[in-house]
């Protein structure tokens, strides 16, 4: 079994889905069975699959990859239901409720010009609610409709909001029924014992600069561990030689409030940059741009990789070369892409569909 891990190196939106899809494509072309594991965050991903954008399935779905939600992934049942996704789910995944979404958005609005940078998906509110056992809701509870309804009523008492408008119980129960009938709630290693997967792709959300341990940027962080922390023990049971893919654009972006390394204007990079997924929105505002501090980038990659006990292969992936004439836009000006000593291989991408080796 081969294990590959795709990690964003910056503030997210680096091209993790593109990288994951290419790994799946190459595996599928060799006839391998593939499982992609989402191991942090929630349905914040924006994967283009066919002519649509999906938040709940792997980018490698088009290449036959199954999708699994790790126990540290926070599931939004409503999104799963609306997108009619078919996935495997760890029984201990925490769940996002409609009231979590509204709570997150209400609090973020109230912050005015001191926003934390929420995506408005309800992740932080769900994580905070889960700290209280009586209000925590886990994926395996979706399989018992009666107990689920009673738990929802109890959570209603925790949130002083109108039940019918905010909690949307009917839709949530429909989502639970959909998941019970169309998805499978199963522990990770139980799934592996029943399926002969040859390639496991762990795909992270967000980027290392948003990791909850990066206290220099608090509170403008995601409430999850972005790098290897959540999955290192699982990986060590599977292999001693995982392939790690740390992804970055040839410049840096940030969508949302908070400090940013070497921020600059889009025009300083390329005024013609078009980002179809990261459009201006109420919660994150306009996409922001910056230059790469290579020393900082390489340091955080090596720090994350050192968490793994074994001999991982560290690879770099640089995307969006088409906007920077094949160069890195760094704090020291434009630079050629050169493989650093700690790195095994460097991959590049100049379009939306393919990643190439150099």
Locate predicted features.
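Non-transmembrane, aqueous-exposed alpha-helical and coiled segments at domain scale
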Residues: 1-358
